[in-house]
Amino acid sequence: MVTTSLSLPEIARETRQASRQLAILTNEERNEALEAIAEALTANADKILEANIADVQTAKAMQLSPALCARLELSPSKLKAAIAGVRDVAKLADPLATMQINRELDQGLILRRITCPLGVLGVIFEARPDALIQITSLAIKSGNGVILKGGKEAIRSCQALVTIIHQALSQTKVNPAAVRLLTTREEIQELLKLDQYIDLIIPRGSNEFVRYIQNNTRIPVLGHADGICHLYIDKEADLSKAIRITVDGKTQYPAACNTIETLLVHQDIARQFLPAVAQALEEKKVKLLGDEATRQMINVPSATEEDWQTEYSDLILSIKIVDSLESAIEHINYYGSRHTEGIVSENFNTAKTFSDRVDAAGVFHNCSTRFADGFRYGFGAEVGISTQKMPPRGPVGLEGLVTYKYQLVGDGHIVADYSGENAQSFTHKDL
């Protein structure tokens, strides 16, 4: 952990206390803290990039995967975008103290449901130092403390970022203890046991990593274990659109969890579509795999059962020919990870059937699955993507980091007056 003699439970307790102070600050005070962070990150950009270059060099020397190295790299443009994201979060509406219910139960007895912070977030992530910036800004805006654990491959970048963030917060109303960084793998095990201090764990990383977190804590976990996304090219697709959407969905950022891993193609247009899309993908250095029907039309290696279950996070794409919309939906609902699925079709009814029947957090029509992102949704940023059925679902921004409490105000009201033979009636009138 970063230069402290405190034990992890003591750090978590301090973060809990700091989060309670943060929760009662005004929106203006929280926004001032975000602006201070943005200014400090800008002023110290060279230090951040220098630390990141050292991390990337070490990762390459250790022969870590190209996908991980791509996530790890914090280019000047990436850092600039992350800083802009901090300011975008500050511009968002205040998620706290929103009145969701304002109801008269009886004269003088008023029930209100008010949004409030969750408390303390434990966020564990691999690579992606820009995620630390996003998460911190969302935590502060939503009034939550946050304990961060980055991957060892990003340790220099994360330490530089948190040091700068602490310096910025020390000049604001936000206690720097609201943002803490852990640096050793052993601390993950201990963090997962701190259910008395941590309200939500958010893991970001490989499917094995996320499943490990889910299986080793009593703390609620928000996240997704897999990003196996599909694109279905319908028999009534505009093929030029289909090619552009396929190429973007696979190559725009192959390491992202919303990148397509399997392309499903209707048999009626496969012979016309596959050679054209294969050429476009191969120009982008994508390795293609195909089922037997696909291999009769284009020269590619065989796709196996394992391929339909694999999140490549790389320039690899499996292709399968299907005989109907129903077959495509069946394949997706069996192999998909409930993340993001897409269809290309000019038939509105076909697209609606697909959207209604596919089980996923996001279902897209005639656009790239890469749009599944909190920033692109207008959330300012995201702490992660959730594929679980219980909310929040999909990209999780500010709304997913707040809960609510019921506040009931009366004037000597007691339940005994509302029970028995002469019970008073409730008015239950929304105000």
Curated annotation (Swiss-Prot):
SUPFAM superfamilies: ALDH-like
Reaction it catalyzes: L-glutamate 5-semialdehyde + phosphate + NADP(+) = L-glutamyl 5-phosphate + NADPH + H(+)
GO biological process, one term: L-proline biosynthetic process
Cellular localisation: Cytoplasm
One GO MF term: NADP binding
KW Nucleotide-binding (keyword) present: no
UniProt keyword annotation of Cell wall biogenesis/degradation present: no
Signal peptide limits: none
Chief place where the protein resides: cytoplasm
EC number: 1.2.1.41
GO cellular component terms attached to this protein's record: cytoplasm
Pathway(s): Amino-acid biosynthesis; L-proline biosynthesis; L-glutamate 5-semialdehyde from L-glutamate: step 2/2
Gene3D superfamilies according to UniProt: Aldehyde Dehydrogenase, Chain A, domain 1, Aldehyde Dehydrogenase, Chain A, domain 2
Keywords, in A-Z order: Amino-acid biosynthesis, Cytoplasm, NADP, Oxidoreductase, Proline biosynthesis
Catalytic class of the enzyme: oxidoreductase
Protein role: Catalyzes the NADPH-dependent reduction of L-glutamate 5-phosphate into L-glutamate 5-semialdehyde and phosphate. The product spontaneously undergoes cyclization to form 1-pyrroline-5-carboxylate.
Stated family: Belongs to the gamma-glutamyl phosphate reductase family.
PANTHER family (UniProt xref): DELTA-1-PYRROLINE-5-CARBOXYLATE SYNTHASE (PTHR11063:SF8), GLUTAMATE SEMIALDEHYDE DEHYDROGENASE (PTHR11063)
Name of protein: Gamma-glutamyl phosphate reductase
Species whose genome carries this gene: Microcystis aeruginosa (strain NIES-843 / IAM M-2473)
